[in-house]
């Protein structure tokens, strides 16, 4: 293998048409972080590599380093998630996670933790019942933010730094997390959360949700909006998948779990 040729294991996050028959792939790899590579001829009807370029396919890849873009020369499929394609809500939630990862991930350095965590949450989403998608999405979003060091603070007041437990609180997007009630005058607060909402937010820091909490749809739908605001503020760009997600969650929605001020 030449010095310009390398191998990696990656999850396809995005694909865009390029020229008449090529695809521009954006792939999260364990070994090199985000890789942007051209798949030559991948859009042709008889392309051998075609199906391996679909979104969320996990491949063993061989790539060639180019001046501006790498080239995808070989791909061997290791894993697919057919469950994501069977439900629009699951697929949209997975695209939401992918969009967040695209904002968070870096190029040219290993991203093992981010890669492994995304794989876990895609597996959970692909297998989850439709009525638990909101829970799986919100937990995945928080966990992916945490591994990147940009998750909001959910256990301590961001003003006084005292622990917050079993109580109502505010949430400041600009301040990066929860604000104790006695500190509300010192921080701009975009959301007011009751005890249940604070407890649900704090559960997101655990490795997995409790079985009972998976059915707290009205809480998770509200907290998705809160985390969305946090992501959009931190990365200074909107999450496009959120628009379709609102439509998917509309039948489940009741009064919002996190109320913007």
Curated annotation (Swiss-Prot):
Keywords: DNA damage, DNA recombination, DNA repair. Belongs to the RecO family. Gene3D superfamilies: Nucleic acid-binding proteins, Recombination protein O, C-terminal domain. This is DNA repair protein RecO. GO terms for cellular component: bacterial nucleoid. SUPFAM superfamilies: ArfGap/RecO-like zinc finger (SSF57863), Nucleic acid-binding proteins (SSF50249). It holds the Pfam family RecO_C. It comes from Gloeobacter violaceus (strain ATCC 29082 / PCC 7421). GO terms for biological process: DNA recombination; double-strand break repair. The keyword DNA repair applies. Involved in DNA repair and RecF pathway recombination. InterPro entries: ARFGAP/RecO (IPR037278), DNA_rep/recomb_RecO_N (IPR022572), NA-bd_OB-fold (IPR012340), RecO (IPR003717), RecO_C (IPR042242). It comes from the Bacteria. The keyword DNA damage applies.
């Amino acid at each position: 293998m030449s010095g310009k040729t390398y191998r990696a294991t990656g999850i396809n996050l995005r694909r865009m048409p390029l020229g008449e028959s090529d695809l521009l792939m954006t792939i999260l790899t364990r070994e090199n972080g985000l890789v942007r590579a051209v798949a030559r001829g991948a859009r042709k009807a008889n392309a051998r590599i075609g199906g391996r370029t679909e979104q969320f396919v996990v491949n063993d890849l061989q790539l060639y380093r180019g001046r501006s873009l790498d080239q995808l020369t070989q791909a061997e499929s290791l894993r697919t998630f057919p469950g994501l394609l069977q439900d629009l809500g699951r697929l949209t939630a997975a695209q939401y996670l992918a969009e967040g990862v695209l904002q968070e991930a870096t190029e040219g350095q290993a991203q093992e933790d981010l890669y492994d965590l995304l794989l876990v949450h895609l597996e959970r989403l692909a297998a989850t019942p439709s009525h638990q998608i909101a829970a799986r999405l919100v937990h995945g979003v928080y966990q992916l933010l945490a591994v990147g060091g940009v998750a909001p603070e959910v256990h301590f007041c961001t003003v006084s730094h005292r622990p917050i437990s079993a109580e109502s609180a505010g949430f400041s997007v600009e301040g990066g997390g929860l604000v104790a009630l006695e500190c509300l005058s010192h921080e701009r607060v975009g959301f007011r959360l009751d005890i249940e909402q604070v407890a649900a937010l704090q559960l997101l820091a655990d490795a997995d949700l409790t079985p009972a909490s998976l059915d707290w749809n009205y809480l998770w739908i509200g907290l998705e909006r809160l985390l969305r605001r946090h992501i959009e503020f931190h990365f200074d760009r909107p999450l496009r998948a959120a628009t379709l997600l609102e439509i998917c969650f509309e039948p489940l929605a009741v009064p919002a779990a996190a109320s913007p001020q």
